[in-house]
Amino acid sequence: MQNLMAGKILLVTGGTQGLGLAIAEAAAREGATGIAIVGRSAEKAERAAAAIRDRAIGGGPEGAARAESGVEVLAIAADLAAPGEAERTVTETLERFGRVDSLVNAAGATSRGTLLDTTRELLDEHLAVNLVAPFMTMQAAVLDMRRRGAPGTILNIISMAMHGGQPYLAPYTASKAGLAGLTRNAAFAHRFDRVRINGLNIGWTATPGETVTQRTFHGADADWLARAEAAQPMGKLGQPDEIADAVVFLLSERSGVVTGSIIDWDQNVPGAYDQ
Protein backbone atom coordinates (compact mmCIF):
# COMPACT_ATOMS: atom_id res chain seq x y z
CA MET A 1 0.00 0.00 0.00
CA GLN A 2 1.37 3.40 -1.05
CA ASN A 3 -1.60 5.55 0.06
CA LEU A 4 -2.01 6.84 -3.50
CA MET A 5 -5.62 7.84 -2.75
CA ALA A 6 -5.09 9.02 0.83
CA GLY A 7 -8.01 11.14 2.01
CA LYS A 8 -9.72 11.17 -1.40
CA ILE A 9 -13.40 10.89 -2.27
CA LEU A 10 -14.06 8.67 -5.28
CA LEU A 11 -17.15 7.92 -7.38
CA VAL A 12 -17.13 4.74 -9.48
CA THR A 13 -19.97 3.96 -11.86
CA GLY A 14 -20.25 0.25 -12.53
CA GLY A 15 -18.54 -0.19 -9.17
CA THR A 16 -20.62 -3.12 -7.94
CA GLN A 17 -18.98 -5.85 -10.03
CA GLY A 18 -16.05 -6.80 -12.23
CA LEU A 19 -13.54 -4.12 -13.11
CA GLY A 20 -15.45 -1.31 -11.39
CA LEU A 21 -15.50 -3.22 -8.11
CA ALA A 22 -11.79 -4.00 -8.43
CA ILE A 23 -11.11 -0.28 -8.91
CA ALA A 24 -13.13 0.64 -5.83
CA GLU A 25 -11.33 -2.01 -3.77
CA ALA A 26 -7.93 -0.79 -4.97
CA ALA A 27 -8.81 2.80 -4.06
CA ALA A 28 -9.88 1.66 -0.60
CA ARG A 29 -6.59 -0.16 -0.08
CA GLU A 30 -4.76 2.97 -1.20
CA GLY A 31 -6.32 5.10 1.51
CA ALA A 32 -9.49 6.60 0.01
CA THR A 33 -11.67 8.11 2.73
CA GLY A 34 -14.98 7.75 0.92
CA ILE A 35 -16.10 5.76 -2.09
CA ALA A 36 -19.45 5.87 -3.87
CA ILE A 37 -20.23 2.88 -6.08
CA VAL A 38 -23.04 2.78 -8.62
CA GLY A 39 -24.94 -0.24 -9.92
CA ARG A 40 -28.42 -1.08 -11.16
CA SER A 41 -29.31 -3.34 -8.22
CA ALA A 42 -29.59 -1.81 -4.74
CA GLU A 43 -29.04 -5.19 -3.10
CA LYS A 44 -25.95 -5.92 -5.18
CA ALA A 45 -24.60 -2.44 -4.49
CA GLU A 46 -24.95 -2.95 -0.73
CA ARG A 47 -23.19 -6.32 -0.92
CA ALA A 48 -20.36 -4.79 -2.92
CA ALA A 49 -20.05 -1.92 -0.44
CA ALA A 50 -19.69 -4.41 2.40
CA ALA A 51 -17.06 -6.34 0.44
CA ILE A 52 -15.05 -3.17 -0.17
CA ARG A 53 -15.08 -2.33 3.53
CA ASP A 54 -13.97 -5.86 4.42
CA ARG A 55 -11.19 -6.05 1.82
CA ALA A 56 -9.84 -2.57 2.52
CA ILE A 57 -7.99 -3.94 5.53
CA GLY A 58 -5.32 -5.58 3.36
CA GLY A 59 -2.52 -7.30 5.27
CA GLY A 60 0.09 -6.41 7.87
CA PRO A 61 0.13 -3.47 10.29
CA GLU A 62 -0.81 -0.93 7.61
CA GLY A 63 -3.88 -2.96 6.74
CA ALA A 64 -4.86 -3.29 10.38
CA ALA A 65 -4.57 0.47 10.86
CA ARG A 66 -6.71 1.03 7.78
CA ALA A 67 -9.36 -1.33 9.14
CA GLU A 68 -9.55 0.70 12.34
CA SER A 69 -9.85 4.02 10.53
CA GLY A 70 -12.31 2.55 8.04
CA VAL A 71 -13.42 3.61 4.60
CA GLU A 72 -16.96 4.87 4.14
CA VAL A 73 -18.69 3.32 1.15
CA LEU A 74 -21.91 4.69 -0.31
CA ALA A 75 -24.00 2.28 -2.41
CA ILE A 76 -26.08 3.99 -5.10
CA ALA A 77 -28.65 2.15 -7.21
CA ALA A 78 -29.17 3.84 -10.58
CA ASP A 79 -30.19 3.04 -14.14
CA LEU A 80 -27.65 5.09 -16.06
CA ALA A 81 -29.66 4.72 -19.26
CA ALA A 82 -32.45 6.82 -17.74
CA PRO A 83 -32.39 10.64 -17.98
CA GLY A 84 -31.16 12.34 -14.82
CA GLU A 85 -29.76 9.21 -13.19
CA ALA A 86 -26.09 9.88 -13.97
CA GLU A 87 -26.28 13.37 -12.50
CA ARG A 88 -28.04 11.97 -9.43
CA THR A 89 -25.09 9.73 -8.62
CA VAL A 90 -22.85 12.78 -8.33
CA THR A 91 -25.46 14.67 -6.32
CA GLU A 92 -25.79 11.81 -3.82
CA THR A 93 -22.01 11.56 -3.53
CA LEU A 94 -21.79 15.29 -2.79
CA GLU A 95 -24.59 15.03 -0.24
CA ARG A 96 -22.76 12.26 1.63
CA PHE A 97 -19.14 13.34 1.31
CA GLY A 98 -19.25 17.03 0.40
CA ARG A 99 -17.02 16.76 -2.65
CA VAL A 100 -15.81 14.53 -5.47
CA ASP A 101 -12.04 14.33 -5.89
CA SER A 102 -11.97 11.58 -8.49
CA LEU A 103 -14.46 10.00 -10.89
CA VAL A 104 -14.27 6.68 -12.71
CA ASN A 105 -16.77 5.88 -15.44
CA ALA A 106 -16.63 2.08 -15.57
CA ALA A 107 -20.28 1.21 -16.27
CA GLY A 108 -20.94 -0.10 -19.74
CA ALA A 109 -23.51 -1.66 -22.05
CA THR A 110 -22.04 -4.53 -24.07
CA SER A 111 -24.91 -6.15 -26.00
CA ARG A 112 -24.15 -7.33 -29.52
CA GLY A 113 -25.30 -5.75 -32.76
CA THR A 114 -24.02 -5.19 -36.30
CA LEU A 115 -24.60 -2.16 -38.47
CA LEU A 116 -27.44 -3.99 -40.22
CA ASP A 117 -29.28 -5.65 -37.33
CA THR A 118 -28.88 -3.10 -34.52
CA THR A 119 -32.22 -1.61 -33.52
CA ARG A 120 -32.65 2.02 -32.56
CA GLU A 121 -33.46 0.84 -29.04
CA LEU A 122 -30.16 -1.04 -28.74
CA LEU A 123 -28.19 1.88 -30.18
CA ASP A 124 -29.88 4.30 -27.79
CA GLU A 125 -29.02 2.03 -24.84
CA HIS A 126 -25.34 1.94 -25.76
CA LEU A 127 -25.13 5.67 -26.32
CA ALA A 128 -27.02 6.40 -23.09
CA VAL A 129 -24.87 4.20 -20.85
CA ASN A 130 -21.49 4.41 -22.58
CA LEU A 131 -21.47 8.05 -23.68
CA VAL A 132 -24.28 10.20 -22.31
CA ALA A 133 -23.95 8.96 -18.72
CA PRO A 134 -20.17 9.63 -18.60
CA PHE A 135 -20.79 13.04 -20.18
CA MET A 136 -23.23 13.95 -17.41
CA THR A 137 -21.19 12.55 -14.51
CA MET A 138 -18.12 14.39 -15.82
CA GLN A 139 -20.11 17.60 -16.15
CA ALA A 140 -21.41 17.40 -12.59
CA ALA A 141 -18.05 16.40 -11.12
CA VAL A 142 -16.09 19.13 -12.92
CA LEU A 143 -18.66 21.73 -11.84
CA ASP A 144 -18.02 20.69 -8.23
CA MET A 145 -14.25 20.83 -8.69
CA ARG A 146 -14.44 24.28 -10.26
CA ARG A 147 -16.80 25.53 -7.57
CA ARG A 148 -14.28 24.52 -4.92
CA GLY A 149 -11.28 25.69 -6.94
CA ALA A 150 -9.77 22.27 -6.37
CA PRO A 151 -7.88 19.95 -8.71
CA GLY A 152 -9.44 16.63 -9.61
CA THR A 153 -9.01 13.52 -11.72
CA ILE A 154 -11.30 11.55 -14.01
CA LEU A 155 -10.66 8.19 -15.63
CA ASN A 156 -12.93 6.79 -18.33
CA ILE A 157 -12.94 3.08 -19.07
CA ILE A 158 -13.08 2.98 -22.85
CA SER A 159 -12.27 -0.08 -25.01
CA MET A 160 -9.88 -1.37 -27.63
CA ALA A 161 -13.04 -1.66 -29.74
CA MET A 162 -12.95 2.11 -30.23
CA HIS A 163 -10.26 1.46 -32.85
CA GLY A 164 -12.82 -0.44 -34.94
CA GLY A 165 -13.94 -3.55 -33.10
CA GLN A 166 -15.63 -6.67 -34.40
CA PRO A 167 -18.59 -6.36 -36.79
CA TYR A 168 -20.99 -7.47 -34.03
CA LEU A 169 -19.89 -4.57 -31.79
CA ALA A 170 -21.17 -1.73 -33.98
CA PRO A 171 -23.17 0.20 -31.32
CA TYR A 172 -20.57 -0.53 -28.64
CA THR A 173 -17.72 0.68 -30.87
CA ALA A 174 -19.60 3.85 -31.80
CA SER A 175 -20.30 4.70 -28.17
CA LYS A 176 -16.76 3.99 -26.97
CA ALA A 177 -15.18 5.96 -29.81
CA GLY A 178 -17.40 8.85 -28.78
CA LEU A 179 -16.23 8.51 -25.17
CA ALA A 180 -12.60 8.61 -26.31
CA GLY A 181 -13.24 11.85 -28.16
CA LEU A 182 -15.09 13.32 -25.19
CA THR A 183 -12.21 12.37 -22.88
CA ARG A 184 -9.68 14.33 -24.92
CA ASN A 185 -12.05 17.26 -25.49
CA ALA A 186 -12.81 17.63 -21.79
CA ALA A 187 -9.16 17.18 -20.81
CA PHE A 188 -8.17 20.06 -23.07
CA ALA A 189 -11.07 22.25 -21.96
CA HIS A 190 -10.33 21.87 -18.25
CA ARG A 191 -6.56 21.63 -18.07
CA PHE A 192 -6.30 25.10 -16.53
CA ASP A 193 -8.87 24.05 -13.94
CA ARG A 194 -6.25 21.41 -13.05
CA VAL A 195 -8.74 18.65 -13.72
CA ARG A 196 -6.87 15.78 -15.35
CA ILE A 197 -8.97 13.47 -17.54
CA ASN A 198 -7.63 10.27 -19.09
CA GLY A 199 -8.93 7.03 -20.56
CA LEU A 200 -7.96 3.37 -20.73
CA ASN A 201 -8.78 1.31 -23.81
CA ILE A 202 -9.39 -2.02 -22.14
CA GLY A 203 -8.79 -5.20 -24.11
CA TRP A 204 -10.26 -8.64 -23.46
CA THR A 205 -10.57 -8.96 -19.68
CA ALA A 206 -11.46 -11.89 -17.44
CA THR A 207 -14.47 -10.80 -15.38
CA PRO A 208 -17.70 -12.52 -14.27
CA GLY A 209 -19.51 -10.23 -16.69
CA GLU A 210 -17.36 -11.46 -19.57
CA THR A 211 -18.29 -15.04 -18.73
CA VAL A 212 -21.97 -14.09 -18.96
CA THR A 213 -21.33 -12.34 -22.27
CA GLN A 214 -19.51 -15.34 -23.73
CA ARG A 215 -22.26 -17.73 -22.69
CA THR A 216 -25.12 -15.45 -23.73
CA PHE A 217 -23.88 -14.32 -27.12
CA HIS A 218 -21.29 -16.90 -28.15
CA GLY A 219 -22.52 -20.19 -26.64
CA ALA A 220 -19.34 -20.61 -24.60
CA ASP A 221 -18.91 -23.67 -22.39
CA ALA A 222 -17.22 -23.97 -19.00
CA ASP A 223 -13.74 -24.17 -20.56
CA TRP A 224 -13.95 -21.00 -22.65
CA LEU A 225 -11.59 -18.99 -20.44
CA ALA A 226 -8.80 -21.58 -20.47
CA ARG A 227 -8.94 -21.84 -24.25
CA ALA A 228 -9.09 -18.08 -24.70
CA GLU A 229 -6.11 -17.49 -22.43
CA ALA A 230 -4.04 -20.20 -24.12
CA ALA A 231 -4.40 -18.34 -27.41
CA GLN A 232 -3.19 -14.99 -26.03
CA PRO A 233 0.41 -13.70 -26.38
CA MET A 234 0.82 -13.39 -22.60
CA GLY A 235 -1.07 -16.61 -21.87
CA LYS A 236 -3.90 -14.87 -20.06
CA LEU A 237 -6.65 -12.30 -20.48
CA GLY A 238 -6.45 -8.90 -18.84
CA GLN A 239 -6.92 -9.05 -15.08
CA PRO A 240 -9.21 -6.60 -13.22
CA ASP A 241 -6.75 -6.15 -10.34
CA GLU A 242 -3.95 -5.17 -12.72
CA ILE A 243 -6.15 -2.68 -14.53
CA ALA A 244 -7.40 -1.30 -11.21
CA ASP A 245 -3.83 -0.56 -10.12
CA ALA A 246 -3.29 1.41 -13.34
CA VAL A 247 -6.52 3.34 -12.79
CA VAL A 248 -5.56 4.28 -9.24
CA PHE A 249 -2.14 5.42 -10.47
CA LEU A 250 -3.73 7.65 -13.12
CA LEU A 251 -6.13 9.10 -10.56
CA SER A 252 -3.32 9.84 -8.12
CA GLU A 253 -0.72 12.59 -7.96
CA ARG A 254 1.90 9.99 -8.89
CA SER A 255 0.79 10.30 -12.53
CA GLY A 256 1.91 13.91 -12.50
CA VAL A 257 0.61 16.20 -15.24
CA VAL A 258 -0.75 13.49 -17.56
CA THR A 259 -4.08 14.48 -19.08
CA GLY A 260 -5.90 13.78 -22.34
CA SER A 261 -4.16 10.42 -22.72
CA ILE A 262 -5.99 7.40 -24.13
CA ILE A 263 -3.89 4.38 -23.21
CA ASP A 264 -4.28 0.99 -24.90
CA TRP A 265 -4.33 -1.61 -22.13
CA ASP A 266 -3.97 -4.75 -24.20
CA GLN A 267 -1.53 -7.39 -25.42
CA ASN A 268 -2.23 -6.80 -29.10
CA VAL A 269 -1.15 -3.78 -31.14
CA PRO A 270 -3.69 -2.03 -33.40
CA GLY A 271 -2.39 -1.53 -36.92
CA ALA A 272 0.39 -4.14 -36.61
CA TYR A 273 0.29 -7.32 -38.72
CA ASP A 274 2.32 -10.54 -38.91
CA GLN A 275 2.65 -10.27 -42.69
Question: Which residues does each predicted region cover?
Answer:
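Alpha-helical segment proximal to the catalytic Tyr-Lys
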Residues: L143, F188-F192, G256
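Short, small/polar-rich loop/turn modules that mediate ligand/substrate recognition or access, typified
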Residues: V104, R191, R196, V258-G260
